[in-house]
């Protein structure tokens, strides 16, 4: 469970129908699974993520809405927190960009 007082929150807009946005998020999740071993589990329009990236425990929830994706993650309380937030924001923007195509 992610506590609101110790969490990072991002909102990234998109222009897709919800199923298409979910599919694009799945591309990103597949990449993170292959690269870092991050696990994910979908429940409707929400996906729960867990694992370790660069030795830092990650727990997050992404919620796919009609015009945006909201990402809430535990705050790792390390010097990497700001970099991690920026990384996730850039990845979400990339995969939700209208011209992005999965290779």
Question: Can you annotate each of these PLM segments?
Answer:
Residues 1-38:
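Terminal, regulation- and interaction-focused segments at domain boundaries
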Residues 12-18, 53-55, 64-66, 73-77, ...:
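Beta-strand elements of well-folded, non-transmembrane domains
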Residues 23-70:
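Ser/Thr-rich, low-complexity intrinsically disordered terminal regions
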Residues 40-41, 66-68, 76, 88-90, ...:
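Short, charged/polar low-complexity linear motifs in solvent-exposed/disordered segments
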Residues 57-58, 79-81:
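A short local loop/turn or secondary-structure capping micro-motif enriched for an aromatic residue
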Residues 80-103:
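A conserved amphipathic terminal alpha-helix motif
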